[in-house]
Amino acid sequence: MRAVAHVSVARSEIRGRRLGRHAARVLTGGSACVIASARGWPRLFTPCLDVTLDAFAAHMEQRRGQPQERLEEALNAARDALACYLDGLVERVLPDVALTAFVLGDEILHAARAGGGRIYVHRKGKTTRLTPRSEPGGGLLTAPLERSETSLHSGDLILAGSSSAFSKEAVERAAAAVGRDASLPPSVLANMLTDPAAQASIGAVAVAARVR
């Protein structure tokens, strides 16, 4: 299965500077997505995100096999790449990267996360949270890897992102919009989720994907 997906990113403002703390990539023609949020020193946000996402994307794009296995292997590759990069740093407190990812299988959505992040599936007027309700700290290096899956159908809407993308205001706006028009473009919904965070300068990333 494939999905039409859109990524929306809001930058964080730290000490008067707007920094990219969050990022996401849509992979394999829309059948997979990875969302990352950097933890630690702001000056290391970009290199940590790049190292982690590059490793995940390369593994997901190049490997063959079952979707769940590819997801697991890509997460391990991302963790190893981040750990290798950090081995070369001299820091009192090492940064980390929270990762949330999903891949579409044959009528099954496979998801996993390490650290904070959320995934929801909206189908025929009902929205179900796929990720656990707990919001663990840390990321790939320190948080447990949590896995989940659910059935998937054409027309389903997947909403995923950093925890900061799912504020009460953002969720209420997106839910009301979908209630009025279930066929809203993914770009509209992704931007709705990150708008409140952008206005508050706290940073967020959201992905909206409609299954075809």
Regions inferred by a protein language model and the residue ranges of each:
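Extreme N-terminal targeting and regulatory segments of eukaryotic proteins
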Residues: 1-10, 58, 67-69, 73-74, ...
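Residue-level marker for buried hydrophobic side chains located in beta-strands
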Residues: 34, 113, 158-160
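Short amphipathic alpha-helical signal-transduction/dimerization elements
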Residues: 53-64, 79, 179-182
